[in-house]
Amino acid sequence: MPSADLPLEECRAYRPELPLPGGFDAFWAGTLGEAPHDGAADKPRYREVDCGLPRIRTYDVSIPGYAGRPVRGWLHMPTGATEPLGCVVEFLGYGRGRGLPHEELMWACAGYAHLVMDTRGQGWSAAAGVTPDTDPGAAGAVPGFLTRGIESPETHYYRRVFTDAVRFVEAMRVHPEVDPARIVVTGVSQGGGIALAVAGLVPGLAGVMPDVPFLCHIARGARIAGLPPYTEIASYLRLHHGRTEQVFRTLSYFDAAHHATRATAPALFSIAMADEICPPSTCFTAYHRYAGRKELRVYEFNGHEGGGAHHRAEQLAWVRDLFTGPPTGRTELS
């Protein structure tokens, strides 16, 4: 597959000016400071389910997210732990739901607690979801989520999703079997963008692992991506002439390249140079702007699948070293 974007050496040097939107920090402080207002339960609920796996305990999770509305997930924990566990909180790719409880077990098998967040309103691709997005979308929105609530940051879909994600991390910080100082967030594509946003919104994380992250330098992605979801924005603007400035202003509050400038936790990025869904220059933008210590794995001949199982092995080693000693992996400086 040919490269879908700038060549690697140009991506390494690519540092566009991305002005932060006005009131960015105040917007997010206000969003996260809002109290739940729909009468939902004010604490997480965990119901153990039998997956037929005696070495792993699995819980059907319901955590109050945006506006206190319940967001579902799975929590996997190794049996027999005698001390608080390190924890990996995972956010999912575009269209994917939490799936079945026995599907994602790698992190629990490695000895960590593993919390998977069901992305509200999603779950039609690869794995089913069960969490609805009850907030109405904007009239005339393109099918998908990038233009849902596009009129303003206050109504946009990802305001709700990012808030849900922060609440999932907060839930693990007070879980009696989790070490609050050893929480890592991760995700692929959309999940990688969410992980970067959480890294900028939640201080004190142990680590961040964004893979081929979506929602980075969104304005560029909308102009050069060959495949969805960024193409949703172009489809919307083909019909709604004169709204370009307003659309990209709204989306700028959810651009992970901005949130990356607020992050401080160590990070392990992956970028695929033949990615037509999340063009590599958009991912490099977030990587270069990331304010914490960072490492990068580049998969020069891969598309949106990224490093696949090879990169999972890189992540396992990185988290092990993060929790038990100084990192030993290859580091690329910005």
Specify the residue positions occupied by each region the protein language model found.
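Hydrolase active-site cap/lid region
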Residues: 196-243, 298
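Acidic catalytic loop of the alpha/beta-hydrolase fold
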Residues: 273-278, 305
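Gly/Ser-rich "nucleophile elbow"/oxyanion-hole loop immediately N-terminal to the catalytic nucleophile
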Residues: 144-188
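Cap/lid segment of the alpha/beta-hydrolase catalytic domain
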Residues: 99, 105-106, 112-163
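Short beta-strand element of the alpha/beta-hydrolase
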Residues: 73-77, 83-94, 114
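Short beta-strand/loop motif that positions the catalytic acidic residue
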Residues: 263, 269-271, 275
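Histidine-bearing beta->alpha loop at or near hydrolase active sites
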Residues: 293, 298-316
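N-terminal targeting or regulatory segments adjacent to alpha/beta-hydrolase or S9 domains
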Residues: 1-56, 328-334
